[in-house]
Amino acid sequence: LALFYQHNINDNTKLGIWQIEEPEDFFLASVPQHRAITHPHKRLQHLAGRYLLKHLFPDFPYEEIVIADTRKPYLPYEQYHFSISHCGNYAAAIVSRKERVGIDIELPTGRIKKISHKFLNIQEREHFHVAGTWLQDKADTSLTLNDKSLTVLWCAKEAVYKWWGWGSVDFSDHILLQPFEIKTEGSIAANFIRMQRIFDLGLQYKVFEGLCLVWLSSAA
């Protein structure tokens, strides 16, 4: 089995990353396919994410999953809160019995820089030095520090968006990341502003070789 990473946050909340090496039939033997997905690889990612839910909590009722108008999957009776993310040959999921959760994984690439102005506000761009130039990392010439840094920031905002689950979020205006030093793993303080409320959120992140992961679990 290709479990790439698992972190049991506590008895009620677990997350994992699955490295997809199995054929589609492996997942179909255990996971019902709820919706028609024509693209073979996207279908494989979808099945791997559903499979991972049951791997983390064997009694997870994935046959009860429904999709909200915002495209967020959820359980109507909220026996579990969960969030799923896919990229490349990876699927990630976080599941909790008690708290709302969000997760995102991404492969670090230069494309994130091209859209950084859309998801980072002025203060964030100034603090993380992404206002028009790449950060210089002489120790890594193949993949600059800034590729990884920007991917962590993007994942953080995506994880908050998935935690919220109600759509209609402006990443630069509604999600504010507090300054922090980006390392291989750590925590991120964020403020989420919606519905005339400010939510103080604590996210965690981990940077693997060629993969960034960010997650959060918090009561709404």
Regions picked out by a protein language model, each given a short descriptive name:
Residues 1-220:
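Core catalytic alpha/beta fold that binds nucleotide/phospho-ligands
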